[in-house]
């Protein structure tokens, strides 16, 4: 049975005989979190409003470990800055996860009607930092900090959500080296699969600060695979434009390529940008009202179009990815990762369902593999670095997994350029 591992493995699992449909009234769909759909609901025993994430375990069989991880982390958290978890119920193959309802939207939603001012940015960042300070003190790493995973209550309280890729450090394991997160927000050391710790969240926070200021992360116009190559290679992004010096310095402090030079969350709470600008969270209710007005106007415009296909996006627990450039890479078998496979989130997979899948590049077997075998052989003979050759080969296969056919395109472009180069006499000096 698809759900047997979950029955024995989830903390907070309620009496299996209890019927969640009797205990809770499921209301409208309010978003899509990691692994499942999220609904507003009522706890019939207390009349309390809750968020209900419903996951079909038969459809999500491959993600059961990730689901367990999210629930395990949430069940261990007790902080006003982290989404509260109330328990889980199993009915047939459906897992009901009951969580705190946060009706103010995500920080990403709040950017939709227009830019934020620096007081709003500082207030949101301060609350994220409080959540990170708590998690890091518990030796937990969120690993997917971004505006979409920051949720607000209707009163302006700010909480971290979507713990599907969160990691736990132990006393003996002070660093991790797994490749998870969302490409645009990923720290260089995570992409390189070097050992990393809670400072990876600080890098992601710096990217989130740019996102809150500009509406999108750096490189959002590029394919995520390209970004994975650029982040470790390039200088850190900076916040360009008409922003205060303290905000630019806050971003710069977070985005140091050397993790040990990044401040801790506790230290950043004392940064002058936060101290000078952050206000009480009730100040954010103005932003929430602005978003609700904007959404109502959008709904009115959309309803006038018969072929409109817009989905309600009011957030509750679980976060939601609403940009083409937002997807989360989840931890999988390290052996698979070495072979270049990449696991996209449910959202990205759903987006790709209607797109005819291109076949994998023929050149992988006819050109790429033989070429790398030859390179390795030559490198071994002269005592070269096999690791860098394998890393390059892995990167090509990783790109192919994300974008089938890209290797054939790359080889064709290379051939064309070489032909143009030789015709223009570029190779004359070689003769």
Curated annotation (Swiss-Prot):
Residues 297-325 are annotated as: Disordered. The modification N-acetylalanine is found at residue 2. The keyword Repressor does not apply. InterPro entries: Kinase-like_dom_sf, PDC10_dimerisation_sf, PDCD10_N, Prot_kinase_dom, Protein_kinase_ATP_BS, STE20/SPS1-PAK. GO terms for biological process: cellular response to oxidative stress; cellular response to starvation; execution phase of apoptosis; intrinsic apoptotic signaling pathway in response to oxidative stress; negative regulation of cell migration; protein autophosphorylation; protein phosphorylation; regulation of axon regeneration. Its cofactor is Mg(2+); Mn(2+); Co(2+); Zn(2+). It is found in: Cytoplasm; Nucleus; Membrane. Belongs to the protein kinase superfamily. STE Ser/Thr protein kinase family. STE20 subfamily. This is Serine/threonine-protein kinase 24. It comes from Mus musculus (Mouse).
């Amino acid at each position: 049975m698809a759900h047997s591992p979950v029955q024995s493995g989830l903390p907070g699992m309620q009496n299996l005989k209890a019927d969640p449909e009797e205990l809770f009234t499921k209301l409208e769909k309010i978003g899509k979190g990691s692994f499942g759909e999220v609904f507003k609901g009522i706890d019939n025993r207390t009349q309390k409003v809750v968020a209900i994430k419903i996951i079909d375990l038969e459809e999500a069989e491959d993600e059961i470990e990730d689901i367990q991880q999210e629930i395990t982390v949430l069940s261990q958290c007790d902080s006003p800055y982290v989404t509260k978890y109330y328990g889980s119920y199993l009915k047939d193959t459906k897992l009901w996860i009951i969580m705190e309802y946060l009706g103010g939207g995500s920080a990403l939603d709040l950017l939709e009607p227009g830019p934020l001012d620096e007081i709003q940015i500082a207030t949101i960042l301060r609350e994220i930092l409080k959540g990170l300070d708590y998690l890091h003190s518990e030796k937990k790493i969120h690993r997917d900090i971004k505006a979409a995973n920051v949720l607000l209550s209707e009163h302006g309280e700010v909480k971290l959500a979507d713990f599907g890729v969160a990691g736990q450090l132990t006393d003996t394991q002070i660093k991790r080296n797994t490749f998870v997160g969302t490409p645009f927000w990923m720290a260089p050391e995570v992409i390189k699969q070097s050992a990393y710790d809670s400072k990876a969240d600080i890098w992601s926070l710096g990217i989130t600060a740019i996102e809150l200021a500009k509406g999108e992360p750096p490189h959002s116009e590029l394919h995520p695979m390209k970004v994975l190559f650029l982040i470790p290679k390039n200088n850190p992004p900076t916040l360009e434009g008409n922003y205060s010096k303290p905000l630019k310095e806050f971003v710069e402090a977070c985005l140091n390529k050397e993790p040990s030079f990044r401040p801790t969350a506790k230290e950043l709470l004392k940064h002058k940008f936060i101290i000078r600008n952050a206000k009480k969270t009730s100040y954010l209710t103005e932003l929430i009202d602005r978003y609700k007005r904007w959404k109502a106007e959008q709904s009115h415009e959309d309803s006038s179009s018969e072929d409109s296909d817009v989905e309600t996006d009011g957030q509750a627990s679980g976060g939601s990815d609403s940009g083409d450039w937002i997807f989360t890479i989840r931890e999988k078998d390290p052996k698979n990762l070495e072979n270049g496979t990449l696991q996209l989130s449910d959202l990205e997979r759903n987006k790709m369902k209607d797109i005819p899948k291109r076949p994998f590049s023929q050149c992988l077997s006819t050109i790429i593999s033989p070429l790398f075998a030859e390179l390795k052989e030559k490198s071994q003979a002269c005592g070269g670095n096999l690791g860098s050759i394998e890393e390059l080969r892995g990167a090509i296969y990783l790109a192919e997994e994300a974008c089938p056919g890209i290797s054939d395109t790359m080889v064709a472009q290379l051939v064309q350029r070489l032909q143009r180069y030789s015709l223009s006499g570029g190779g004359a000096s070689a003769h």
